[in-house]
Amino acid sequence: MEKTFETPGGVRLSVEIHAGLVVVTAGAVDRTVVTLEADNAGAADLVERATVECRPSGSRHVVEVKLPRVYGMRLLRRNAVTVRVEVPERAEIEVATASADLEINGPVGDVDFKTASGNASIDDVAADVTTKTASGSVTIGTVGGDIRASTVSGDLRCSSVAGAAHFSATSGDLELGAAGSRVEVKATSGNVRLGELAAGADVKNVSGNVRVLALGEGQLHVRSVSGDVAVGVVKGVQLHVDVETASGLVHSDIPLRDGPVGGAGRPEARVDLSVRSVSGNVEIGRALEHVA
């Protein structure tokens, strides 16, 4: 099945699918093309009963794709149904699945992805991202706005976010390459790896390790029970340190006293580092020595 809609002025795409694969490609076009593919008889029946509609909403168009739910013995293998959608750049994307995967290529606007066990690979988002998964993993490139992502056991990875970042995970690992605003992380047993932080972070973790590669400005608060904590501080900033661990070890390559970190940098920038741990070790050093 294939349907083409003329959609000048912007698009909001909504896809509901139980199992399968959703591929969204954004480009310099003024139309939206929806293609539904099936590779077996059961999947073909779902495609036949799917609804694909387009309606105007103010100055933009809303394109809705809905496939029937799959129950009991009629569960299909993961990618038996594929939904391919070509949309204009900066289209808003909303996808809800049970186990279907999502792949977004090209620059899009707001993205909202909810799934139980589906995975997501998202390329370039000009606005905000919201993802919620149980066991699915999410990988995101650049985010021009804010990101809010939560998972139970899946991994979360994002290359960079211009705005604020809010992450929540139980046993999945969290990784963020760079953030232009404040970062908030709540984790239980997964590892947390943060790259370049321009405005600090609040990190709470129970047993996973926490690693911050380059803290450049702002306040970093880390609360951990048994996981190790490693922090790299950018040279030249004013550093203020408050570290406590009950039974873990504290090691620092720079003096743990208030004052500038050695080397050229930004003396007007201030970093407040606060770490509390029960049994985890704490390591503090210069940022370049921590970057892998």
Protein language model annotation of sequence segments:
Residues M1-A292:
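Intrinsically disordered, low-complexity terminal regions
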